[in-house]
Amino acid sequence: MKKEEREVLLREKLCQMKEFERELTENGICYIAGVDEVGRGPLAGPVVAAAVVLPPDFSLLGVDDSKKLSEKKREALAAEIRELAWAIGIGKREPARIDEINILEATKEAMADAVQEAERLLRERFGQEAKIGHILFDAIHLDGLETPQTSLIHGDARSVSIAAASIIAKVTRDHQMIEYAGQYPDYSFEKNKGYGTRAHYEGI
């Protein structure tokens, strides 16, 4: 496929993935957060959630479900998302908390923290009246939120905000697992990121 043809396809994909955000913006919603997590399946490491608020004119090509992207591509996109986003919040829950309350509840806590941090950063940037007007979640619902929310099945492949959050969450967690690799060299965390590969099982 020629470069020009690929770019056309990427622009079409981006247009499709902005549809949810576009509809909300047309209904008067100013700040829309996409939220996703990574780390619900590994044998080791934290669950990490990200909340990303993008400007309506966001036009970075290639943003997609982080699982569909190479590590090199995720790293490059994450750097650009951090430059372009209006706000990015991160939430984490470590293994001890996951064991205490279960992975789903730990994920929800991490997501709530990520949303709270993103909103705080919005206020710092745009003033105390700024607040998230709608939250797009990837296949999850958070109880107790006053902010309107939508849960999208396969949201990281359907919403650009959720996709951006999936990339930020993945890169953030990967960096933490690389740090863990220095502390626990037997488990190859720098390669498997805590997932159940053969090397990880052999380390156990």
Regions found by a protein language model. Give the residues of each.
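RNase H-like, Mg2+-dependent phosphodiesterase core
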Residues: M1-I204
